[in-house]
């Protein structure tokens, strides 16, 4: 370093940050960006600009570069690939030394990788497609407070997906009527019920009143059915201090699970809450409100697989993932790719699922995938087949829209779920024989028969906006 000299002025980024001969280290954090450069900007220069601005670079040479080892700390754009079917975009693969990031801080990683660089003039659009977190970083993160197996043990539920429901209408109910709806759903056969993401503490329903009436409903349904029940009490609030106060009260009421809107509240709040849940034996359900603002544009933003990985590191026992078959956006292959990132201990590179890197999660517990949004009993065979046992299938309108009421809707979904699981275990093809399986089960369940008739014409057949870039 003593032999370095300072040459003032502006240099092309690719002279420093484009390193095609570099072989990434096991300890490097790897990123894949989809880049659309401005007209006239070479790919190598655009990739190097992204590497520079997301690591050590600035727009001009500065003399303080001489006071550190820039060769060690810089991000390196080491590979470029074409994007199938898009002549303007390309993939830029960038390696970052681990020492650029604070241990255990997803916040710090995102501040660098999706910070100022996304407003950079050298690129027309930029999307973070995937990250490879090194195991050395993963070991510094708390991860899920409980994880899949511990949750199953706490709730004593095995061998099938869990069955849930978001209470509707999402806004406007009094606390007492809200608690009544919870009781009817749980008493009818659901395992879990849920606050919607925008229920916090509004004038029509203050949080403390809701918590008390819901706790009464959960305890009553548990006692009457002999099954362990739960309700996701949303503790999201305007301040972290208020959020923690609500979490403490849920614990005082003896409730097993709370809920958090992790994107609107932020990763700092989420990690704080996850650490508290781990120390206090509480399960943590995570809603992804605001995700589509960030991830739906296929050319600019952050792919949800990255948000899912970050959530697993930050902490959560459940995460909403879309349904593939319901009312919300979700490509099947892509969804399966990030569901694997939530649940598996090792996920290999698989471009057919949008997975750009091998990802080793070590011994970090997994996260339950939550399928929710516009689903009903006719979707049950596909949902069981797509999401498997380590999931929560949540039917909001598909429970409470039943002509017989909440309890009847819950019973219909429980019968449908158990029929599908039984058929799967017997080797039947759920997606090919699903209709027959449900109709057979409906012969002995009036509630299911009515549900099948009610929703037989309901479909959400819209093309997926954010499709995988595969040929």
UniProtKB/Swiss-Prot annotation:
The keyword Lyase applies. Keywords: Bacterial microcompartment, Calvin cycle, Carbon dioxide fixation, Carboxysome, Lyase, Magnesium, Metal-binding, Monooxygenase, Oxidoreductase. InterPro entries: RuBisCO, RuBisCO_lsu_C, RuBisCO_lsu_C_sf, RuBisCO_lsu_fd_N, RuBisCO_lsu_N_sf, RuBisCO_lsuI. It is found in: Carboxysome. Binds 1 Mg(2+) ion per subunit. GO terms for molecular function: magnesium ion binding; monooxygenase activity; ribulose-bisphosphate carboxylase activity. Its EC number is 4.1.1.39. One of its GO terms (cellular component) is carboxysome. Mg(2+) binds at residues 194, 196-197. RuBisCO catalyzes two reactions: the carboxylation of D-ribulose 1,5-bisphosphate, the primary event in carbon dioxide fixation, as well as the oxidative fragmentation of the pentose substrate. Both reactions occur simultaneously and in competition at the same active site. The basic functional RuBisCO is composed of a large chain homodimer in a 'head-to-tail' conformation. In form I RuBisCO this homodimer is arranged in a barrel-like tetramer with the small subunits forming a tetrameric 'cap' on each end of the 'barrel'. This is Ribulose bisphosphate carboxylase large chain 2. The gene is cbbL2.
